UniProtKB/Swiss-Prot annotation:
Protein name according to UniProt: PTS system mannitol-specific EIICB component
Keyword Membrane attributed: yes
GO biological process: phosphoenolpyruvate-dependent sugar phosphotransferase system
UniProt remark on domains: The EIIC type-2 domain forms the PTS system translocation channel and contains the specific substrate-binding site. The PTS EIIB type-2 domain is phosphorylated by phospho-EIIA on a cysteinyl residue. Then, it transfers the phosphoryl group to the sugar substrate concomitantly with the sugar uptake processed by the PTS EIIC type-2 domain.
Any one cellular-component term (Gene Ontology): plasma membrane
GO molecular function: kinase activity; protein-N(PI)-phosphohistidine-mannitol phosphotransferase system transmembrane transporter activity; protein-phosphocysteine-sugar phosphotransferase activity
Encoding gene (name): mtlA
Domain PTS EIIC type-2: 18-342
Length: 471
């Protein structure tokens, strides 16, 4: 049983790591996607302010700018700027070799370019004669980048283009058959397992952008970012929950619905796993409503705030988008309320559900004594505390802000920052993560002192840590 649980946990970590890598190529470039979405929503013939001149920006941005940014970011993730340059160069091959926006190709060629130039540099390290370093560096990047561009143009581009067209046709078929709402049966559990960024930015967004380029909008942008299912669950906790869960729910509602940080509601589901049915019911009903109203967005909304959704909503789609969010909220609230009111142990709160949650998640519980940290002791001198989450922008930023304020009030002059889990800095003394991500954090930075929390918004571990640092 223990062996099976360890295998399940290891598999989940691998899936999270792969998903984090996919979303890591998209997330840093969200600003560019939003810029393209705004220009599209405003200036295309069916936009709010039709303008033939400005509309000329739409095509080149989606064809060249966005894939090149993804390719550069993918290469940079492997081998810093040098990898990014080769990755972007190689991406140009798939762009020119295809007649559709090549996001999938960019997500392949960018990392491949970074990987190959990294391996080349490792092979020649220490073998280049003094004075020839710059020559070798520049020409090696140019030659490898050029060869990859040619290979991508003639080989990878057409193959990826065919795959992308097949996937797009499959999505259109699913939409035509009105089966798209069933996707949330898989999306909602995946979100709670911290695969939300991978699902949205690694899978749905590339397909949605291709669809939006043809039709001016895509319903795929609404599948994962819809705040309705999470809002309904948090409202149910606020009205029918007990203990810390009830007390923290109002603040979580603001952060989730207005701030767009969906990770805030995941612990509320994980502490009562049956509530995943409420999330699924809300997600399915919301997407069904979007389908009925033929609603869609012009670009990916990030974060998943109601403000971001409305900002990316094209003309004539506001009623459908708002209806989908409201229906999803109402349905998830109704289902969650039934489960919360009928629960036998109503006194269970969010700070006491850790052990049960981890058993259900298929991993050994190590949170009860996390600050004791059986494997390590807290460093004698702490200079930097880093909060880490999957993307490094949402829940970790929220937790870092809370702890930073507590540190200031306690008179402790310690740097508190946040980052993506795959970009943890080597000089971090203490790393704080959600307990479902701690295994990955320990693999990335084994020498640091690791703290697991169940809820970034309201964790007693912050006060315990401050007391330990005062000693």
């Amino acid at each position: 049983m223990t062996h099976t649980s360890e295998n399940q946990a290891g598999f989940r970590v691998k899936i999270q790591r792969f998903g984090s890598y996919l979303s890591g190529m998209i997330m840093p470039n969200i600003g560019a996607f939003i810029a393209w979405g705004i220009i599209t929503a405003l200036f295309i013939p069916t936009g709010w302010l039709p303008n033939e001149t400005f509309a000329k920006l739409v095509g080149p941005m989606i064809t060249y700018l966005l894939p090149l940014l993804i390719g550069y970011t993918g290469g940079k993730m492997i081998y810093d700027v040098r990898g990014g340059v080769v990755g972007a160069t190689a991406t140009m091959g798939v762009i020119v070799g295809s007649d559709i926006p090549m996001f999938l190709g960019a997500m392949i060629m960018g990392p491949l370019g970074g990987y190959l130039i990294k391996k080349f540099d490792q092979q020649i390290q220490g073998k280049v004669k003094q004075g020839f370093e710059m020559l070798v560096n520049n020409f090696s990047a140019g030659i490898i980048g050029g060869l990859l561009t040619l290979a991508a143009f003639k080989g990878v581009g057409p193959v990826v283009s065919a795959i992308s067209k097949t996937l797009a046709a499959g999505v259109e078929k699913i939409v035509d058959l009105h089966l798209l709402p069933l996707a949330n049966i898989f999306i909602e559990p995946g979100k709670v397992l911290f695969l939300n960024n991978a699902i949205n930015h690694g899978i749905l967004s590339p397909l949605g952008i291709e669809q939006a380029a043809k039709t001016g909008k895509s319903i795929l942008f609404l599948l994962e970012p819809n705040p309705g299912p999470g809002l309904g669950i948090l409202l149910a906790y606020w009205l029918f929950g007990k203990g810390m869960a009830k007390q923290s729910a109002p603040g979580a509602i603001i952060i989730h619905f207005l701030g767009g940080i969906h990770e805030i509601y995941f612990p509320y589901v994980l502490m009562r796993p049956i509530l995943i049915l409420a999330a699924i019911a809300g997600g399915v009903s919301g997407v069904l409503t979007f389908t009925i109203f033929d609603a869609g967005l012009v670009a990916v909304p990030s974060p998943g705030s109601i403000f971001a959704l409305l900002a990316m909503t094209p003309k004539g789609n506001y009623l459908g988008v708002l209806a989908g969010v409201l229906v999803a909220t109402a349905v998830s609230f109704f289902v969650a309320s039934i489960f919360l009111k009928s629960a036998k142990n109503n006194e269970e709160d969010i700070t006491k559900a850790t052990e049960k949650m981890q058993q259900l998640k298929g991993k050994k519980s190590d949170v009860v004594a996390v600050l004791k940290n059986e494997e390590k002791v807290i460093p004698a001198k702490v200079k930097k505390i880093v909060f880490a989450c999957d993307a490094g922008m949402g829940s970790s930023a929220m937790g870092a802000s809370i702890l930073r304020n507590k540190m200031q009030k306690a008179g402790l002059n310690i740097e508190v920052t946040n980052t993506a889990i795959n970009q943890l800095p080597e000089d971090a003394d203490i790393v704080i993560t959600h307990q479902n991500l701690t295994d990955r954090a320990k693999e990335k930075l084994p020498k640091a002192f690791h703290i697991s929390v169940e809820n970034f918004l309201n964790s007693p571990k912050y006060d315990e840590l401050i007391e330990m640092l005062k000693k």
